[in-house]
């Protein structure tokens, strides 16, 4: 039986935003990288009736990057969620789904954490809540945990980003990321400019870079009126994908993904009942792919990995 989200009267009123005060995380452990998935021999392979080219496009919007030369960000084991404004019962459902999905790719993840860096906020007016957060934190905590390797970590939000976050929609989100030294990278300081420098222990590579991107915080705001219609499970998996993968805000997603739940900014009755094998393959490929490359190279690797993972269980032609 599909249980729609309860009316907004089921949620606590008059919530404050004091829970959005972040503390700086300390320490970082470089993840272990999996070998790149080889390019498939058949470039015309079809997954769920979708061509390789279309799968690549899906990857680009489901694991998004500000531009092709940026790097894709992912979490390390310091992910620590806080849910505010939801009924106690759904808090448990949401956290259970989020931890279950995260533990597949984040080894060493602990539920016993103190520094909250994933704020999932249920509001009676998502637009108003975002504006309140923006007024209090104009940078949306951007760059708060950066060591200064990349000035992009500190750039102010663009007008386009702010407008997208202010638009009426069931769910809105924003990720803060930090540029970190990649595995095998030495960080130094230029004696004249004082700027941080990077160099590779083994001399470097034409493709591999000296840096990688790490997700440091995520703010998710659910408008409880606009989001109504979905089941708790659907919404929990939708939020889990948002937190773990970083899809593009405002995009319409293919119906094979739980992310199609709110296409066209409204609940879609035809959306999957839960996170799909395609969604899971995207997340696993993201966390197994090479991190020290530009986003377009990594998205290609993720595309190939998704096709490789799903090809044996699907009818491909």
Language model: regions and residue ranges:
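Compositionally biased P/S/T/G-rich terminal and signal peptide-adjacent segments
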Residues: 50-75
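Bacterial N-terminal signal peptides
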Residues: 18-27
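N-terminal secretory signal peptides that target proteins for export/translocation
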Residues: 1-12
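Long, folded non-catalytic interaction modules
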Residues: 82-102, 106-317
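N-terminal secretion/transport leader regions
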Residues: 40-50
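Boundary at the C-terminal end of the N-terminal hydrophobic targeting segment
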Residues: 29-36
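Hydrophobic beta-strand segments of well-ordered beta-sheets in folded domains
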Residues: 43-45, 75-81, 218
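Short, flexible turn/loop "capping" segments at secondary-structure junctions
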Residues: 39, 71-76, 212
